[in-house]
Amino acid sequence: MGIHVPSNVPMESTPFKGMEFEADEIACGFYNEHGKKAGFSIKKEYVNKYKKTGVVTSRRFVCAKEGVRGKDKRNQNVKNPRAKTRCGCEARLVIVLNRDSKKYVVSEFIVEHNHYLHLPSTVHMMPSQRKAATTHAIEIDLAHESGLRLKQSYELLSKQVGGYDNLGFTK
């Protein structure tokens, strides 16, 4: 499959070694936005914290296709086995707390992916990009309480916002 490097991402949206963030969640949001523009989904892999204070000292964000799924312990003759979603991708962003400045600094950034990246037209379907707005969730609940089926309320809401890709979530 080869190595795939995002080429359509502006430099100001690309993290780099030594880049600083005020908080770990800001770094997560920045890397998630980078992933959206590049065509991949992210996940939080691990976090290290001070035991006494609970302050995050380091954190790793990885491509959602990082690692490989373990052997399925269920019956081997299942009709619909789960699709393989992970392929051992090494792309990641690691941040470490600088004790002097109290800021999080990028200590490692690997940009290369070992899988194809998503097209801009399908980016909104990736797990880290799907965010249901509170107002949308309330509207779907109200429609369900009014007797509409979930699919019908989803279609109604998608028409209100101008299409499925503007919703930010799937059924």
What kind of region is each of these model predictions?
Residues 1-127:
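Short, conserved DNA-binding cores of transcription-related domains
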Residues 117-171:
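Short, positively charged, Gly/Tyr-enriched micro-motifs
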